[in-house]
């Protein structure tokens, strides 16, 4: 007991002799984000003996991007989309078909959604005109979209726009996003007329009118490189004759084709100075020029027939009259009768 009291007395004396001695307690904490914090603890005693406060904070922060890979993501299929526009001859309804063509395998791509946009100028924003999704959606646009999974075709229908319009459709599938752009030129195609010349040959006249639009970059229909082709199967048929005509007071460009067989619909491909129109299905109407000519030929044939009949009747009457005059002019020969014979008795 005496020894313990002696030790305590020695410690107290040493504290009074060295009041500037400092005692520090250091603790190091490592945070989960690699941040090291070093701090000291300050202790005050009733004898005014204080431990020096020494605080050192060392922070080491490391930043790294976090990448999350979904293990359920499917491999995207490589494919392209080709769109063709068509409209009825009366130019009221619009129909378009976008064909999905696979490049890397024979499986059909899983199209999740398709959104179509349109604009009438080349610099303005696109406006959504149609939407189709594999999930239920209430978004209705100006165009009706339906997808044929068997044929891998997107079918688009609606009212034909009143002016040339640029369309683009965005196809979203697993891991892929593809845009398909196509144009619908409304005004250049004035009319398409067809005439059946015989059982194996058909004459088609395509009438186009001048059209100015920003998509044409200032080009003209009368440019030497501007032309029209018709599709007959896999063949592109060039025009047989190109000329300028005036129809109903309008200046038009006429392209004449001769096709083998009889058609009610033709695939039209127009190119104006390097800018190609979307291939368009155009319904053929009977050629009014041919109908007018046919009517004129019919009337002319009828008149010729009537003239021939009249000439024939006139000839017959004249011949008969001439025969009558000849009968009158001929001298009448008296018939010599034999001398009466009387029998002698």
UniProtKB/Swiss-Prot annotation:
Record keywords: Glycoprotein, Host-virus interaction, Immunoglobulin domain, Membrane, Modulation of host immunity by viral IgG Fc receptor-like protein, Signal, Transmembrane, Transmembrane helix, Viral immunoevasion, Virion
Spans within the Intravirion topological domain: 315-345
Membrane-traversing stretches: 294-314
One GO cellular component term noted in the UniProt record for this chain: membrane
Protein's UniProt keywords contain Transmembrane: yes
Localization terms from the record: Virion membrane
Glycosylation sites: 34, 48, 95, 104, 148, 179, 198, 217, 225, 241, 244, 260
Signal peptide annotation: 1-23
Domain of life: Viruses
Virion surface topological domain: 24-293
Protein task: Serves as a receptor for the Fc part of human IgG. May thus be involved in interfering with host Ig-mediated immune responses.
Protein's UniProt name: Viral Fc-gamma receptor-like protein UL119
Gene designation: UL119/UL118
């Amino acid at each position: 007991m005496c020894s313990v009291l002696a030790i305590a007395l020695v410690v107290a004396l040493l504290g009074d002799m060295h009041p500037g001695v400092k005692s520090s307690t250091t603790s190091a904490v490592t945070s989960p984000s690699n941040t090291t914090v070093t701090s000291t603890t300050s202790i005050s005693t009733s004898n005014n003996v204080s431990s020096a406060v020494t605080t050192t904070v060392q922070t080491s922060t490391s930043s790294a991007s976090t990448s999350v890979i979904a293990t359920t993501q499917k491999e995207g299929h490589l494919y392209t989309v080709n769109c063709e526009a068509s409209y009825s001859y009366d130019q009221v309804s619009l129909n378009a078909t976008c064909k999905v063509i696979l490049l890397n395998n024979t499986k059909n791509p899983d199209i999740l959604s398709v959104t179509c946009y349109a604009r009438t100028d080349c610099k303005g924003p696109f406006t959504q005109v149609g939407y189709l999704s594999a999930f239920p959606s209430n978004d209705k646009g100006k165009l009706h979209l339906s997808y044929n999974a068997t044929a891998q075709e997107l079918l688009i229908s609606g009212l034909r726009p009143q002016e040339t319009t640029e369309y683009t459709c965005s196809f979203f599938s697993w891991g892929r996003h593809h845009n398909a752009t196509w144009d619908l030129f409304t005004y250049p195609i004035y009319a398409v007329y067809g005439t059946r010349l015989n059982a194996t040959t058909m004459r088609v006249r395509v009438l186009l009118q001048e059209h100015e639009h920003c998509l044409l970059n200032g080009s003209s229909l009368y440019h030497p490189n501007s032309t029209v082709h018709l599709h007959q199967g896999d063949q592109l048929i060039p025009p047989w004759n190109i000329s300028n005509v005036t129809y109903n007071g309008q200046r038009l460009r006429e392209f004449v084709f001769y096709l083998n067989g009889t058609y009610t619909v033709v695939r039209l491909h127009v190119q104006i100075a390097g800018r190609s129109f979307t291939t368009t299905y155009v319904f053929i109407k009977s050629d009014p020029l041919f109908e007018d000519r046919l009517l004129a030929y019919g009337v002319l044939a009828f008149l010729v027939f009537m003239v021939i009949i009249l000439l024939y009747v006139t000839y017959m009457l004249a011949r008969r009259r001439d025969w009558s005059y000849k009968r009158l002019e001929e001298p009448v020969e008296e018939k010599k009768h034999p001398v009466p014979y009387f029998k002698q008795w």
